[in-house]
Amino acid sequence: MKTKGYLHLSPSLRINENWKSYQKKIQDPSFIQKYAFYPLMHSIIKERKYKKVNSEKHLNEKERTHNFKLNDFKFEKTAKKRPLHYATHFDALIYGYYASILNELYETALKKDLGLDDCVNAYRKIILDETGKGKSTIHFAKEVFDEIRDRSDCQEEVGVLTFDIESFFSSLDHQLLEKKWSDLLGEEELPPDHKNVFKSCTNFSYVLRDDLRIRIQKSGKQSGFDEKKLAKIRREKGFKSFFESNADFRNTIKQGKLRIYKNSFYNKEKIQVGIPQGLPISAVLANLYLLDFDKNILNKVVKDKGGFYRRYSDDIIIVANVDDLEEIKNYVENLIKQSNLKISSSKTESFVFRKSIYNQEQNSRLTSFKQVEGNERKDAPLIYLGFEFRGYNTCIKSTNIAKFYRRLISIVRRRSNRAIRNKNPNIPKAVFKNQIKKLYKKPLRDLDGENREIKQTFRNRTFLVENERNEFSMIVKPFVNKNKSNYFSYIKRCEKIFDSKIFSKQLRKKEHLLNTAIAKHLNK
């Protein structure tokens, strides 16, 4: 149990002081079966998928370009929206406790089938070596690429299939999930406490975080929250919350000032489906839901066909003989349908890897050939877990590099606008490169949105301390996490694990891009 600092509908908790009472409650089945869960907090993370493109220049077949200097743009605008729901502090403790129960049983179930433990990678701590450190997506991607290379040494052609489950979390069938949950517990039906937790995950309610702002705006910069009220609650009550009490929360709803929404995930038959993404229990439920699917793929593809199978959440990859690809593809799609899920047809891809001559000396190397409607597209990369693999090389996914560059440009634009607003006629306006570099070298986890500056390297930990007037004031204690990762340390880890220097070369344009961005935004 850890103290969390985020704002929610109910009070933040003092775990260090009251952990025994919290533990007693969450481990009491009779308490949990009657417990009324709070509404979740809902927000949406938008991930930009396509850049502006020029209709005449630098236009490839996918209508994408990464050229920063072009001005004659049209828009090919798409954004991936990921809905996130997160629970109140106490509810999160309950979800975390029941997630630990299910996760222990799930891990035991994986180890009962030889090879199944290796197939499922996401949301699990898979120990790397005797140091106790866990594997990362870098290790998982390398294992797949190494498998393709190893097979190419003894096979003329190696086949690869990739699948993506469409809207995974928001499409889980409730009846199937409940059955798999009770089966894992070894029960005919869920015990009352588990049943109540299940209902809170499937028949959930939520509020929109933006509805708690001072003014609700459909576009433009969002207004802030009622900082005067938040400060008053902190000072007088000694906790962080949008509301000072349950009565305050209920009155706000009764007065029509805050709307409560119900689970909005429905299938084509208008039947409610899905679980929230963002709860401490969501990950293990997603893995549990596909447990039988993973077992069937292991038996059919790995054991019967001699294939190689890995699933990372909703990303599926299979390495097999080329002659078996069509049969395996149909089998996977039919099996997913039995789970009342759907494979994204636009993200289903087929590859053949084989040796190909690449120079006048007739030298050959392992090369990827993407299979597209009966044709082959040479050198089209296999994209998996943020990497592009062409057989003869592995590099960071180009869109991830572009995202890093966009963040850099965003920082320059904000700093330039600030310099222009604050300019003194006697002082030349300037943006200092070293300050920019310090910002874009900050930890990956501190990146707060595509168009916002990066947060500080250290994290301020705040504590509410009662003073002699029986009021609470905020005490700030800086905390430096030396293990935080930034984009450059990630690149170094890639180079170490893959034993390749190609990754740092992908960032060779950063200085040029920085200078170009400064020249453009500072002199506009």
Predicted regions and their residues:
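Short amphipathic alpha-helices in soluble, non-transmembrane regions
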Residues: 328-336
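Short, conserved non-catalytic motifs in the polymerase core
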Residues: 51, 56-96, 113-132, 162, ...
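Conserved polymerase palm-domain catalytic core
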Residues: 155-312, 317-329, 379
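Non-catalytic, polymerase-adjacent accessory regions of viral genome-replication enzymes
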Residues: 1-77, 494-524
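Active-site and adjacent loop segments of nucleotide-processing enzymes
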Residues: 273, 277-280, 365-524
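A conserved non-catalytic segment of reverse transcriptases
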Residues: 199-253, 346-432
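Beta-rich nucleic-acid/ligand-interaction surfaces
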Residues: 119-125, 309, 317-320, 349-359
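Active-site-proximal segment of RNA-dependent polymerases
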Residues: 99-174, 196-216
